[in-house]
Amino acid sequence: MAVALDSQIDAPLEVEGCLIMKVEKDPEWASEPILEGSDSSETFRKCFRQFCYEDVTGPHEAFSKLWELCCRWLKPEMRSKEQILELLVIEQFLTILPEKIQAWAQKQCPQSGEEAVALVVHLEKETGRLRQQVSSPVHREKHSPLGAAWEVADFQPEQVETQPRAVSREEPGSLHSGHQEQLNRKRERRPLPKNARPSPWVPALADEWNTLDQEVTTTRLPAGSQEPVKDVHVARGFSYRKSVHQIPAQRDLYRDFRKENVGNVVSLGSAVSTSNKITRLEQRKEPWTLGLHSSNKRSILRSNYVKEKSVHAIQVPARSAGKTWREQQQWGLEDEKIAGVHWSYEETKTFLAILKESRFYETLQACPRNSQVYGAVAEWLRECGFLRTPEQCRTKFKSLQKSYRKVRNGHMLEPCAFFEDMDALLNPAARAPSTDKPKEMIPVPRLKRIAISAKEHISLVEEEEAAEDSDDDEIGIEFIRKSEIHGAPVLFQNLSGVHWGYEETKTFLDILRETRFYEALQACHRKSKLYGAVAEQLRECGFLRTPEQCRTKFKSLQKSYRKVKNGHVLESCAFYKEMDALINSRASAPSPSTPEEVPSPSRQERGGIEVEPQEPTGWEPEETSQEAVIEDSCSERMSEEEIVQEPEFQGPPGLLQSPNDFEIGSSIKEDPTQIVYKDMEQHRALIEKSKRVVSQSTDPSKYRKRECISGRQWENLQGIRQGKPMSQPRDLGKAVVHQRPFVGKRPYRLLKYGESFGRSTRLMCRMTHHKENPYKCGVCGKCFGRSRSLIRHQRIHTGEKPFKCLDCGKSFNDSSNFGAHQRIHTGEKPYRCGECGKCFSQSSSLIIHQRTHTGEKPYQCGECGKSFTNSSHFSAHRRVHTGENPYKCVDCEKSFNNCTRFREHRRIHTGEKPYGCAQCGKRFSKSSVLTKHREVHVREKPLPHPPSLYCPENPHKGKTDEFRKTF
């Protein structure tokens, strides 16, 4: 607040029977000098803070000047460390105060922290006394006795009228006896005359309610008279619009005061019509403002609301019918600044208390990602004084769940601050036991309408997959309801997220081994009702799964089983025996409940066989083992699961053509001109050369004798396995589809692009690549064909890296990069070359390596015609022609066009030598120098030397893998 100026009350003058009071400044108080020492110290402090670099000639002089000013301000030769620290804290304390209060407090020059706090406390007490005095009703006819005369202090930023000591005598137990006496010891005290009867002054009601320097009318009554006399105008400087937002208590004080007296105030002899302002006051709104939209004002209002609630026991306001959470989204950027990202302790406790209400978690049970639920939670938070968006509420709850799981599983050392609250929310056993009452009301701080039913046994558990391949498409909050089946609590120890536990997978396979399930899967592997029944069986056993999750899990088990059986992976499948018993025993078993197939008209009458695009069953894989390896080793192509999820193609009849006709009983001729994928021909040759496990025989007579052909262990061709001729059109269609890898036929042709495909699913995949990309990035405008690709791309703009390595702390924005990074720590190298047996941790590295055996160099320079096997080498070569040097050293400003040379150059400045000799221990900054150094040991002792290790001195500056070079 501003400096309080005393009101020196001169001797009263009798003019025509009226008592005239004159208010003027106290010259002694204004002209009294400040204590020595404090003035000089404050002067040096201001000089130190306001010092400019332009005032001196150079940096040395600037530093010396600052040192001198700081020493003169803090005086380290006289003060101790604690005193200097106290001065710095006092300065910061005065800085964080509101602007006007800060100016008033700085003029007092407090010498200690207690004195600075006492100044602010004194101001708050004065404001509280002002509230109590003004809140008393104003009577026109009936006036208080002379002994109860009082004067209202105006806490203006520039001037504050202080009560005379006569009022203090009326308050023997005043709380201002401490610091108030120290401030008023220099003031002249003059008691009011006994014949004076002052009436309370009120600010004039101007049209804008914020007029500066208002003329305030004070009514004085003559001695023994009851009629008001002509007023005497006393000029008071009052800037209400500025001070009302700086001191919330004074704002509320004057709001209540004006509401009571707005009809009785007379300013300058004219009444003011204030019906609209009274209406706004009744609605708890300020009559002088239309809305508070600035961040500073909102934060002050919020703190004032919390303060009033704690001091005056104001109840939580009823739910307003005004702005809802949807309208919050239309607020400006300033509201987003208030919302922020950080959640305080009190805000989080309130948030968890709201979520404990039964209607919220019951609604989330039905729909985990219900935006309306989080919108209602955000509205409740807003009523409690916290502004949050629905998306922020959802993200916060997700983060709390993640921290709770880490602490519970022992993955995080530091404790979760809200572990007990989350445990009570997510664990039914942690809740209080139910009493005789059906619903027990548990009191929640700051919320009186939230009732928690202790009888509700619902656990909200969310498990995220570390790889997050689906990009939260199937990840959400899953609710587990306890089953009455014996042993269900043990099963509930497994988290019900995307991850499947061992016991849950065993139960899932046991359910699939039932006759009704595998026979239905035999007919159609994508039947949603079938997986829905499996999900129901899992739910009865205590595991909550969706039909889509069951289908995806079964597909994943099929893929793992196929890889292990064909020797494509080194590690064994945990459920290999169960899958082998499920597939092999059921494949040859008869199907008594299978409906008889209706024989269709012979296709010989039409002169040929027209192979229709039919969807493969669950017992017949969509891709061969060779194609599966291609998709595993090349991350740019669509995965097998993505192909399965493509809808069945339904296009015009003329879109698919079969150029070759096959007759039953006729021999199938081999076509030497095979139509292959133009963009995958070389990669297919590489993979087939390294992963081929069957012979490429084209003799149709040997086809029926082979039980495992091209790795297709999922085929359900009873006629082929038993050596019987296939008479049914369905079996014949499968035989034709199977013979295509041997005859090279690709009957499906896309007319628009002229490319042929061997399977209808491949055609649909190709059409997917050529269609319009519906998912567009709002930042850069890039389009994508799948939503998960857009989500993964948006992390580039937001900088989000949700995948964090627990070993080194490095974060990634993509699950594939995170998985490749984890192989560095585990040493896993699942990709093996079929020629030399060398293993790699990434599929892209295997593809690049295989080009050394085939001699393929797909990247050719258009300028000089030079070819490269690696895209990075090709990009570095192009910079030779363009002259681009993107890698610039910050120390010497030297530029490089190659990142490898740039890293070698950086080691000159850092002194890093990551390459060390295993024999003599010498270290080098370049691998080429280490190679030359090895020749010295070879000449001395011509024996095979041990490989030297790449051990960087600073693991954050160099590579982390081993460096080995052989001769």
From Swiss-Prot:
Q: Name one GO biological process term.
A: regulation of transcription by RNA polymerase II
Molecular function terms from GO: DNA-binding transcription factor activity, RNA polymerase II-specific; RNA polymerase II cis-regulatory region sequence-specific DNA binding; zinc ion binding
Provide the cross-link position: Glycyl lysine isopeptide (Lys-Gly) (interchain with G-Cter in SUMO2). 22, 242, 259, 277, 337, 482, 529, 734, 745, 752
SUPFAM superfamilies from the UniProt entry: beta-beta-alpha zinc fingers, Cysteine proteinases, KRAB domain (Kruppel-associated box), Retrovirus capsid dimerization domain-like
Q: Name one GO cellular component term.
A: nucleus
UniProt biased composition (Low complexity)? 586-602
Functional summary from the UniProt entry: May be involved in transcriptional regulation.
- Please identify the protein, giving its name as recorded: Zinc finger protein with KRAB and SCAN domains 2
Taxonomic source organism: Homo sapiens
Q: What taxonomic ancestry is recorded?
A: Eukaryota, Metazoa, Chordata, Craniata, Vertebrata
Q: Which gene encodes it?
A: ZKSCAN2
